[in-house]
């Protein structure tokens, strides 16, 4: 069943069920649950994914685990892509399929196929900052219109997808955050400042939220 049809009592206890399994990231969990609740309440545009979230923080603080637990508690699948495997220009073809006449045309696109097969899921794109810049054009399309057309003209529908992208962009700077500004810059603010340097404004502007994870 789509998350929009989840009964309210299950959603009401969602925060606590996630916190039971994730320690020390209460603020991050709150933001994620809030995004799901907004989708449930019909407060988002029908032609967009349920949520488009960027998780930032150092390695090993639970970014991927929150996505896993969220999917499990919502009773939907987790579809994961490691974006460090999509660093080359031709990586776009892997996600949406190669053009006619090219090797791999018959294979279709890995992302479009996955969403057509599992249209109701948490889509996790790990280490998004490593993806080739052309892949961001695909993501803008997904965040804007909740659909993607593959190489054969078939559409994948992202309206019941919670899109979560993880990044450790800025984590290394955050540890130096107390330098300067008389120590007033929080590590979270330092990470968010680095996010602005790492990602294009049109990408950041389309996110439902940027969620900071602390170590």
Regions found by a protein language model. Give the residues of each.
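AAA+ P-loop NTPase nucleotide-binding core of proteostasis motors
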Residues: 1-215
């Amino acid at each position: 069943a789509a998350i929009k049809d989840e009964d309210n009592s299950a959603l009401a206890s969602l925060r606590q069920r996630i916190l039971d399994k994730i320690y020390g990231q209460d603020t991050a969990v709150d933001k994620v649950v809030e995004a799901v609740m907004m989708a449930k309440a019909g407060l988002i545009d029908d032609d967009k994914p349920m949520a488009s979230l960027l998780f930032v923080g150092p390695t090993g603080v639970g970014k991927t685990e929150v996505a896993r637990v969220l999917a499990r508690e919502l009773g939907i699948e987790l579809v994961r892509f490691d974006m460090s495997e999509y660093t080359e220009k031709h990586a776009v073809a892997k996600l949406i399929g190669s053009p006619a006449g090219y090797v791999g045309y018959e294979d279709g696109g890995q992302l479009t196929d996955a969403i057509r097969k599992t249209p109701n899921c948490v889509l996790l794109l790990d280490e998004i900052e490593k993806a080739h810049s052309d892949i961001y054009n695909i993501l803008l399309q997904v965040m804007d219109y909740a659909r993607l057309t593959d190489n054969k003209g078939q559409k994948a529908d992202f309206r019941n997808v919670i899109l979560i992208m993880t990044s450790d962009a800025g984590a290394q700077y955050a540890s130096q955050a107390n330098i300067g500004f008389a120590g007033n810059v929080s590590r979270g603010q330092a990470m968010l400042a680095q996010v602005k340097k790492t990602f294009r404004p049109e990408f950041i502007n389309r996110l439902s939220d940027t969620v900071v994870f602390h170590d």
